[in-house]
Curated annotation (Swiss-Prot):
Xref: InterPro entries: ATP_synth_b/b'su_bac/chlpt (IPR002146)
The protein's role, per its UniProt record: F(1)F(0) ATP synthase produces ATP from ADP in the presence of a proton or sodium gradient. F-type ATPases consist of two structural domains, F(1) containing the extramembraneous catalytic core and F(0) containing the membrane proton channel, linked together by a central stalk and a peripheral stalk. During catalysis, ATP synthesis in the catalytic domain of F(1) is coupled via a rotary mechanism of the central stalk subunits to proton translocation. Component of the F(0) channel, it forms part of the peripheral stalk, linking F(1) to F(0).
Organism in which the protein naturally occurs: Liriodendron tulipifera
Lineage: Eukaryota, Viridiplantae, Streptophyta, Embryophyta, Tracheophyta
Entry GO MF terms: proton-transporting ATP synthase activity, rotational mechanism
Positions of transmembrane segments: 27-49
Any GO CC annotation of this UniProt entry: chloroplast thylakoid membrane
Localization annotation: Plastid, Chloroplast thylakoid membrane
Keyword tags: ATP synthesis, CF(0), Chloroplast, Hydrogen ion transport, Ion transport, Membrane, Plastid, Thylakoid, Transmembrane, Transmembrane helix, Transport
Protein name per its UniProtKB record: ATP synthase subunit b, chloroplastic
CDD domains, per the entry: ATP-synt_Fo_b
Subunit structure: F-type ATPases have 2 components, F(1) - the catalytic core - and F(0) - the membrane proton channel. F(1) has five subunits: alpha(3), beta(3), gamma(1), delta(1), epsilon(1). F(0) has four main subunits: a(1), b(1), b'(1) and c(10-14). The alpha and beta chains form an alternating ring which encloses part of the gamma chain. F(1) is attached to F(0) by a central stalk formed by the gamma and epsilon chains, while a peripheral stalk is formed by the delta, b and b' chains.
Miscellaneous field: In plastids the F-type ATPase is also known as CF(1)CF(0).
Family statement: Belongs to the ATPase B chain family.
């Protein structure tokens, strides 16, 4: 490495009269030296620079392609999600409408069942009242019949004598005899 550096340093000490050499003093360089240095840099650096630029260009294009593919995929997923959302919204509306109609139907069924139950209860109440009335009437009749029977028995016992018994028996025998003649 030292030899390479020494060779460049020795180039700087060559006499500039009549020979070609590099002037390493940047402030003392002239336009020709600068153009030679630039020419050498362009000639040798052109390939490296174009390779770097091509690599950079390929990476940028690859990144753009990947971004476009990702964008298209995202757009496709967005459209699918929108389609699913529309479908779910339609199903929700359908459920909502069906739910409201189902609620109305159940409400009407409940009202009808309630009216039927009330009607049955009213009929049962009326039947119970009628039954209780009949039972009360029958009890009153039995009581009246018992009192009348007791009164009649009391009257018969108080007024009974053998003559009355004989007349009652003969009247009953006469009634039975008349009935026998009618049936024959």
């Amino acid at each position: 490495m030292k030899n390479v550096t020494d060779s460049f340093v020795s180039l700087g000490y060559w006499p500039s009269a009549g020979s070609f050499g590099f002037n390493t003093d940047i402030l003392a360089t002239n336009l020709i030296n600068l153009s030679v240095v630039l020419g050498v840099l362009i000639f040798f650096g052109k390939g490296v620079l174009s390779d770097l630029l091509d690599n950079r260009k390929q990476r940028i294009l690859s990144t753009i392609r990947n971004s476009e593919e990702l964008r298209e995929g995202a757009i496709e997923q967005l459209e699918k999600a929108r389609a699913r959302l529309r479908k779910v919204e339609m199903e929700a509306d359908e459920f909502r409408v069906n739910g409201y109609s189902e609620i109305e139907r159940e409400k009407q069924n409940l009202i009808n069942a309630t009216y039927e139950n009330l009607e049955r209860l009213e009929n049962y109440k009326n039947e119970t009242i009628h039954f209780e009335e009949q039972r009360a009437i029958n009890q009153v009749r039995q009581r009246v019949f018992q009192q009348a029977l007791q009164g009649a028995l009391g009257t018969l016992n108080s007024c009974s004598n053998s003559e009355l018994h004989l007349r009652t028996i003969s009247a009953n025998i006469g009634v039975l005899g008349a009935m026998k003649e009618i049936t024959d």
